[in-house]
């Protein structure tokens, strides 16, 4: 059974008015066809739906669609653009915590990429975007290196910078 069959059974057996669908996953995959040059360069598009299928789903089920975008946890972006990733000075490579790779939240290139993907998703028909992992790695590892010194003030500045772009 595919995911849509499971979702259909939920619709039949419950009263659902909202659905959250991944747009950009914690693996870094974008789940719709996009012309975004960075997504194409990273070969991370895994098309699961398109504008027509979303419109059909919304209209047939009278749904409010929320698109989930994983923001700064992105192994594909971090590996393809290590200069934009959190760096581990002890291992002299990009930082990984339990297999999770993080983009440096101060990276304008990464911020713009995520915003561009999110805007494109809105054009597909999503009513709202839910940003997830809009944070720094939760480790206090002394070997993590960011472009900006990792102070409380810089962390707030960088997260707010992203949020300002998202408005």
Region spans (language model):
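Glycine-rich, aromatic-flanked loop segments that form ligand/cofactor-binding clefts
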Residues: 18-23, 46-94, 130
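Active-site neighborhood of glycoside hydrolase catalytic domains
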Residues: 123-124, 128, 132, 137, ...
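Aromatic- and glycine-enriched glycan-recognition loops and surfaces
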Residues: 2-13, 40-61, 154-161
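The substrate-binding groove and active-site-proximal loops of carbohydrate-active enzymes
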Residues: 1, 35-48, 98-112, 149-156
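Solvent-exposed loop/turn segments at secondary-structure junctions
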Residues: 24-29, 71-75, 135-138
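Aromatic- and acidic-residue-enriched segments that line the glycan-binding/catalytic groove
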Residues: 31-42, 74-96, 139-150
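Active-site-adjacent "subsite" loops/lids of carbohydrate-active enzymes
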Residues: 1, 72-123
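Catalytic domains of carbohydrate-active enzymes, especially glycoside hydrolases
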Residues: 3-29, 122-129
């Amino acid at each position: 059974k595919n995911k849509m069959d499971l979702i259909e059974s939920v619709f039949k057996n419950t009263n659902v008015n909202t659905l959250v669908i991944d747009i950009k996953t914690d693996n870094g995959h974008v789940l719709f066809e996009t012309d975004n040059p960075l997504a194409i360069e990273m070969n991370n598009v895994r098309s699961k739906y398109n504008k027509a299928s979303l419109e059909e789903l919304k209209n047939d089920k009278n749904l409010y669609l929320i698109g989930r975008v994983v923001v700064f946890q992105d192994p594909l972006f971090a590996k393809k653009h290590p200069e934009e990733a959190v760096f581990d000075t002890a291992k002299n490579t990009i930082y990984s915590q339990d297999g999770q790779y993080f983009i440096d939240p101060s990276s304008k290139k990464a911020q713009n990429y995520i915003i561009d993907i999110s805007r494109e998703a809105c054009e597909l028909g999503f009513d709202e975007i839910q940003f997830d992992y809009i944070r720094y790695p939760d480790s206090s590892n002394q070997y993590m290196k960011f472009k900006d010194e990792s102070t409380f003030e810089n962390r707030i500045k960088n997260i707010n910078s992203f949020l300002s772009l998202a408005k």
